[in-house]
Amino acid sequence: MKILYLSAYFQPEVTSSSYLSDNRNQAFAYRGYEMVVYTPMPTRGISEELRSEYKSRKTEIMYDGKMVVHRFNLMREGRNPITRALRYAISCIKQLYFGIFGKDARKCDMMFISSTPPIQGAMAAIVKKVRGIPMIYNLQDIFPDSLVGTGMTKKGSVLWKIGRVIENFTYRNADKIIVISEDFKQNIIEKGVPEDKIEVIYNWVDENAVVPIPKEKNDLFDELNISRDKFNVVYAGNFGHAQNIDIILKAAEKLKNNTEICFELFGTGGLKDHFINKAKELSLENIHFHPLQPYNRVSNVYSLADVGIVSCKKGIGKGAMPSKTWSILSAGTTVVANYDKGTDIENILTTNDIGLFSDANDIDAFVNAILKLYNDRELCKDMGVRGREFIINNLTKDIGTSKIINIVEQIKANIIR
């Protein structure tokens, strides 16, 4: 049984969800599935030297012969949204061709397609119609809702309407849709997707890769000159509109007279310089910005934290499920969330007593949550321990990949039947 991937990004590219793809592919190979991948030359998160190496590496065999990767030439990804959209469009056109006419693609029995970029699913749906093979759609980002949340468009706009047409076409043609939260499930049910087509599989964390590291053994403190004696509040991730970094700066401003509390922010993104300059304008000496760390140092990042922040712009929480939540918990660190009420994150944190929750944009509640844990270190420590236990019992790599394998087995059974 062969699975076809038409992927916008593939290793060695570095994205926040790279480990999920790697874990899933390892699981497929272990269970005997063969995989065929068509993907552009790598671009994201790699050096020009490494990209040059791959220009001559058109075909690659991986996972002990279980996967063949075909790479095609495509311009490097830039920051300009227009050129990025053009790159996505060209990539999808090429993948449409390969998906229909590619020699190895024509030997595949089903497709596993991710939701980045938003037109990826629609392209795969056309391949399905032509080839007559089933499609599993892995929905990591709800489009066009995500564009509304980041301020790129408004509900009811022409772009939004086009997005809804693309979204409906994709959902209608998918045989199974994997969503990463109950909020996502409810969202697409309200858009007319039958419930029996949807499977909720939370993004897992590799519990053996993201582990608690004692402060005295965490060399990141020394590398970045971060004090082990302070109460460290850590944010790691993208600096964009959706993450509501402003609420973190406001909290730092309210707590600037408490010299024992420091905010350590890791990441990248188009607005990072804006927030750095804003912190300078506010004369915030209790907030420090650091480069995004590679995945193999996630344990170090969250283990230097006494609490880890998960935040969002008000109104978009039900259209997102930050995987950093699981990384924070896997590192044995307590979560402080400033997020939309009524979401999965609120339910999981409060039900399992593994973090403190405040409504998005409620600065006073957010600051009080930080202060509560600062003043009660035993509570902070106990929540972190329970968070690690929650991951081990619910969101490990084996648990997550097994659920995906089960869906593939269901599709396989229908094909054989």
At which residue positions do the language-model features occur?
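N-terminal subdomain of nucleotide-sugar transferases
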Residues: 1-61, 417
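Carbohydrate-associated surface elements
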Residues: 41, 183, 204
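A short helix/loop element that forms part of the nucleotide-sugar donor recognition site in Leloir-type
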Residues: 53-59, 211-226
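Membrane-proximal helix-turn-helix segments that form the acceptor-binding/catalytic region
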Residues: 100, 119-122, 126-130, 157-179
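Conserved donor-binding/catalytic core segment of Leloir-type glycosyltransferases
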Residues: 227-243, 249-252, 264
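Nucleotide-sugar-dependent
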Residues: 243, 290, 294-301, 308-329, ...
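Nucleotide-activated donor-binding/catalytic signature segment of Leloir-type glycosyltransferases, i.e.
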Residues: 259-260, 264-267, 273-299
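A short, well-ordered alpha-helix in the C-terminal region of glycosyltransferases
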Residues: 365, 372, 379-393
